[in-house]
Amino acid sequence: MVKRRTVKYFLRRILALFVLCVPIYYLYTTVQRPPGYTKLKGSTRRKALIKKTFIESWTDYETYGWGKDEYYPIIKRGRNYLRKGMGWMIIDSLDTMMIMGLDEQVLRAREWVNNSLTWNQDDEEVSVFETTIRILGGLLSSYHLSQDKLYLDRAVDLADRLLAAYNTSTGLPRSNVNLGTRKSRKRTREYFVSTAESGTVQMELRYLSYLTGDPKYWITADKTMEVLLGDATWSHTGLVPITVNLITGAYVGRNIRLGSHGDSYYEYLLKQDLQLFSSGTVYRKAFDLSVDGIIEYLLNYTTPNHFAYIAELPGGLEHAQLPKMDHLVCFLPGTLMWGATNGTSLEAARTSKNWGTRQERDVKLAQELMRTCYEMYNMTATGLAPEIVFFDVDQTKNEIYSKRRDQHNLMRPETVESLFILYRITRDEIYREWGWNIFVSFLRYSRLPGRDAFTCLDSVESKKVKDQRDKTESFWFAETLKYLYLLFEDDFSILPLTNYTFNTEAHPFPNIENNMDLYTV
């Protein structure tokens, strides 16, 4: 016999469902979203949620890791690179807070910089490259945005200590320096240094000379580029190996790639020219030559979906491609688009007298590579990209795939950086949608359960909490959330790409006139 359900029974069920749903709805609208969120529209709503995510994640760091250079949110603990800390996390994140208008957080960070920060520590050597792009760059952009001389004073003190690393026969910097003793004692293996590290310090040094009127930083930057562009064995190809000998100035080996140890060298070829108001410098010529080399030697496509990718040449120009691409390479779509248009809208750029087949080619390639970089996210179980992907050239696997050892995600910024640049220049809403999908995936899988903390993942193919890696990188605050926030900024007069150039750590510098009369390259 079938039991009959009365009206009273159904009413009780509806009431129970209502009682269950109301608290969930309340939590979703008041806890997960910022106040007033429902009154906002479109991009403004999304920008507000990204800002709220920054506040929550930063508050977790302030609570459990304040002042530490590294932060491990699962164990709620931090670690310093030097005994008293370097301000790694705080200074790297400072200009993001300024851009988002987080006055209270900026004030607390400033108090730490004023009262606790000292470079006079001699217990360990630090990376010249990382310290330059994150801390020197962060201080300089924070000074520009606030006009607070504290940051400029700290920048001068830091840069003077970093200059000790450039005391080599070529002027190329050693990899590490002791900020306290102003010496480099760690022997670099056979004096080999990374091409990217040597070629990604110039924007910061030149801007500091511009601000202070002291030419020594600008001269130091020029000397490094004289060496990096001066090896005749490679200069005609536009592509260079990922290692250089700081004693002889010659490139070492034949390994060419746009991933680790190569990436930002090519990025700064363009950005050094943009920083000087696209004045037709030798750096622009070198960048254009490098793009030609990338297209001739590194560019390839999958079958049948025609995903563009930038391969590696571990054996040099005369050897076979390795169909492998680091997430780091996803800086390239934005760089190509920026280089083709000089930061103006694509519509306006196409009416310029300087527009031609080269610029159209670079725009097309930027859009193709952007599609590939987004697919690196779209193809995974979590919607987040692995650190490295491979491309199937034998048509035996998926067109884009990752190996287990490369499936970790560090919440890197390169893809959202390029999405921001492509949206600003093309106004194509697809780039906002892709960026939003990536942000939502961070919310779902990088957030710690029951916490407003975010951490890296061990595997983007696992949705399990146990596969969360205990580390919040400073570039989560300095770059990833900043670029996502700016992606949904409707006012393009804020940090316009025609007047600002972002360093490789997303610190915005205003473009400058070369009034130093030091342009020696």
UniProtKB/Swiss-Prot annotation:
Disulfide bonds join 330-373. InterPro entries: 6hp_glycosidase-like_sf (IPR012341), Glyco_hydro_47 (IPR001382), Glycosyl_Hydrolase_47 (IPR050749), Seven-hairpin_glycosidases (IPR036026). The active site is at 387 (proton donor). Its cofactor is Ca(2+). Ca(2+) binds at residue 504. Its main location: membrane. Inhibited by kifunensine. Keywords: Calcium, Disulfide bond, Glycoprotein, Glycosidase, Hydrolase, Membrane, Metal-binding, Signal-anchor, Transmembrane, Transmembrane helix. Residues 1-8 are cytoplasmic. This is Endoplasmic reticulum mannosyl-oligosaccharide 1,2-alpha-mannosidase. It holds the Pfam family Glyco_hydro_47. It is found in: Membrane. One of its GO terms (biological process) is ubiquitin-dependent glycoprotein ERAD pathway. It is a single-pass type II membrane protein. SUPFAM superfamilies: Seven-hairpin glycosidases (SSF48225). GO terms for molecular function: calcium ion binding; mannosyl-oligosaccharide 1,2-alpha-mannosidase activity. Residues 32-521 are lumenal. It is an enzyme of class 3 (hydrolase). The chain crosses the membrane at residues 9-31. Involved in glycoprotein quality control as it is important for the targeting of misfolded glycoproteins for degradation. It trims a single alpha-1,2-linked mannose residue from Man(9)GlcNAc(2) to produce Man(8)GlcNAc(2) with low efficiency. GO terms for cellular component: cytoplasm; endoplasmic reticulum; endoplasmic reticulum membrane; membrane. Its EC number is 3.2.1.113. Belongs to the glycosyl hydrolase 47 family. Pathway: Protein modification; protein glycosylation.
